[in-house]
Amino acid sequence: MIGLPSGTRVWIVAGHTDMRKGFDGLAAVAQTALAANPFCGHVFVFRGRRGDILKVLWFDGQGLMLLAKRLERGRFVWPQATSGMCR
């Protein structure tokens, strides 16, 4: 179990993201699409085109963590937003 500090914000990147991206690519998406600093300690959540994969990017103060979850059946429900983010 990974515990997040209290006050940590979770940013959901609306739409779909290329799941081939790794640490640097997803950090760049957080900077460009959300105008957010990926090294601020907040959590950034990305969804793939098919909707069956999520990736979570988090800077824990020592380095970036990249977590992934793939569903064997079904899809993650995802918000739609024109600005690229949902709060």
Labelled PLM ranges:
Residues 1-87:
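Polybasic/polar functional segments that serve as interface/processing modules
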